[in-house]
Amino acid sequence: MSRPSDLIESDIKPFAEDWEDPKPGEEHYSTNQLIAAYKAGYAKGVAGAHALLQETFNRNYQKSGEDTGKVIEKLQEFGLNPLSALLRVVSWEEFEVLITLPEAEFLDEKLESAYDFVGEFENSARTNHYCLSFRFCPTVDGLDEQKMKSDGFTIAHRLLVK
């Protein structure tokens, strides 16, 4: 952790060549030194926050894939045959998955058990910085991928890619 005087010594340039600015650690700092120290600290803070968001997104993205795999396997245990699972990234912490099923299975009572399982699964997986939700959609004559992409579902899960 750097001290304010470390920031000032390493990050502040003299305001004017003709004037001797107070040196860090003396009785006071010039306005320009304070502004420069603020900017330097702010830039370091933004970089740290960006790195933390990127790390959290990467972890959540990985987890959403793993969790979707678990749901697909459970749906198959219920006797359902998902055709595709498409991901939409809403934010760094929120993900939505659209699972397509044959129309006959979408109307089958087995889907009720799947909805119960998925609801419990979503609640158990949710944390302060991770939210995954699932939707189901019937398909009759295949999936119009262009329409799904226009709705933001652009990433296919590998378990169901043919």
Residue locations for each model-derived region?
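Amphipathic alpha-helical interaction surfaces
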Residues: 74-77, 81, 100-103, 120-124
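Short edge beta-strands and adjacent turn/loop segments
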Residues: 75-96
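A short interface-forming secondary-structure element
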Residues: 95-113
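Catalytic "initiation/cleavage/transfer" segments centered on a nucleophilic residue
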Residues: 5-37, 126-162
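Helical scaffold of the NTase/Pol beta-like nucleotidyltransferase catalytic core
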Residues: 31-81
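Short, internal active-site loops enriched in acidic
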Residues: 90-93, 102-103, 138-144
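Short, non-transmembrane amphipathic alpha-helical segments
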Residues: 107-131
